[in-house]
């Protein structure tokens, strides 16, 4: 049987959201017996590379990587921003993107979408963003991302000694890369979220915060800078001895992530995000029965609406001028802003309900 020559282009070897999405698409492509799959690897901002030869998927990507784009590809899957797509890379070209986490996108992206044979997005939210800006909705398909299959295996965990060393038995979990240099430009809204937590549980020795984060890389220098930044944020919030804030930095394996989400000391996942194209960590946490407190807007509603979660109220607000780059984030576009005080209110409210049975909250076992 003659196989089709298929290429996937994107940040396949990076520790990033797009990198994870790339590898999900790659796994599906190599499962097809009728595809001869090649890889064109690109960077993703300043994110770290994953070059672990013992990881079978990483090894397979490296083995299939090519440098020459001028090959007679039959199909291309380009997991990138729309302006990075090449509509002439193959005979049939499919763009895969989470676009941008605002209510509309760069108008130039509309033409980029219309030039591709098909566009795949991870959520109805992302599709709406593109369509609201003028893209052809008939050319855009929604295919959701997925949590790791290994999460469904009961014994598939790897102990994180970090958690065993934490003295607080009730902890909120925040995951996310710090994506902006100030409180106004950080898309994940981590600055305000940490402040709300510290203020809500000031002087409370029974509750802690586990903050899994970085500034873009999993290096020692990045860790030092990250710890320094978080300490300054906590200090600005007027923290005393309590609550305890625990910083978790560096790459985690799928087994370690499962251990983190399902650990008895982790009581809630908290995100006051301003916008998500999909929100994979939210799905991962929910798949393990971890209760979620999240902004009631953007990509994660596709799956969180299938069950129940604590919805943080929001107002659509124009993005701050320090976030505007007129390439990805456009002037006068809007994202969600959780009103001051809302996060703290819900944090205090849910201290009482931390004993909820996880089994009743497993809402996202998507097949």
Language model features by range: what are they?
Residues 1-72, 208:
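N-terminal pre-catalytic "stem/leader" segment of glycosyltransferase-like enzymes
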Residues 7-9, 46-131:
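Extended catalytic core of nucleotide-activated donor transferases of GT-like folds
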Residues 21-23, 28, 150-256:
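Conserved catalytic-core segment of nucleotide-activated headgroup transferases in glycan assembly
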Residues 117-128, 136-155, 312:
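Donor nucleotide-sugar binding/catalytic pocket of nucleotide-sugar-dependent glycosyltransferases
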Residues 259-277, 287-290:
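Acidic donor-binding loop of glycosyltransferase active sites
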Residues 291-294, 310-311:
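Short hydrophobic beta-strand element within catalytic cores of glycosyltransferases
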Residues 340, 348-366:
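Conserved donor-nucleotide binding/catalytic region of nucleotide-linked donor-dependent transferases
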